[in-house]
Amino acid sequence: MGRKRISSRRFRARAVARPTFPSGELGDVTDLRNAAETAIHQCLDLGAEESIAVVTDDERRPIGEALYEVAAEVTADATFVQYPPGDQHGQEPPEPVAAAMKSADAFLAPTTRSLSHTRARSAACEAGARGATLPGITEQVMVAGLDADYEAIASHCEDVLDQLGDADEIRVTNPAGTDITFAVGDREWHEDTGMIRESGSFSNLPAGEVFVAPADANGTFVVDGTMMPHGLLGEEQTLSFEVADGHVTDISDDAVSEDVAAAREKVGDAATNLAELGIGTNVGVAELVGSVLLDEKAAGTVHIAIGDNASIGGD
């Protein structure tokens, strides 16, 4: 047990990265197929005797089709369901979508709005289905985050846990001015390897991170990567957050500060709670793109989230 220090060249609070694609290659059919093959073969390890449901919406159809086409080459029991995009994250999908997820051995959900925290998703996993949601996925993010070696990503997760798993305290610094210390306490570290092979298991894709809900945190963290509502920050743009006793006390950016203040009026102190310390382990992600789903997974980066963390072991 002891204290660990992390120095990160790039640092973000729940934000994301832009891989540089040569002209004309973004969304290339071959690249998209390679990424789909990773999801079906490496992540799900789908079997010929299994059933799978690919559920998508009107705005993510090309990604859904790529996943379905690869799945249909593995099993004759592959279902494709498309519906209009929801209005917000966490909105329940239409009943036929929920039924398809629940009745399958495996599911993949590339959708505009997240199905991660829906009754439909949890009911599917409780019924024994294993699967992944891909909220807000784009072809660029799909290729950058899934055309990768997920066995290597899982190994990298284990390496990071070996280094940090027994630490009582973790200090994060970077040249932009981040200097924040987390007390881990008895909180459990989690790993998101993207290997979804056990009945009832669930993940986001692209995957690749280890994370913990810290018991306490104090200091300053400076975001120089991705931060909503701004997306990918400019080269000289940074946002700073002051943290005391596990809560954000000051934010340098007016737009973000207003968002957090509005959330606090609705949910109270949970809006300022320092919810998560995460470390990216996806060795296939070379650059930030401005998508939280991908950027927080980039190997060698650190992300911090504020908000409710009960689902990952917080209070």
Language-model segments: residues:
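Short, solvent-exposed amphipathic alpha-helical segments in soluble enzyme
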Residues: 67-73, 123-126, 187-189, 237-240, ...
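C-terminal, non-catalytic macromolecule-binding modules
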Residues: 245, 250-280, 286
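Active-site bordering "gate/hinge" segments
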Residues: 19-222, 226-231
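Short polybasic amphipathic segments
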Residues: 168-173, 239-242, 251, 302
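Cysteine/selenocysteine-centered motifs that mediate thiol-based redox chemistry or coordinate metal-sulfur cofactors
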Residues: 270-315
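A broadly conserved detector of short glycine/acidic/proline-rich loop/turn motifs that flank catalytic sites
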Residues: 58, 176, 186, 225-227, ...
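Terminal disorder- and signal-encoded targeting elements
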Residues: 1-29
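Oxyanion-binding "anion nests"
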Residues: 214-261
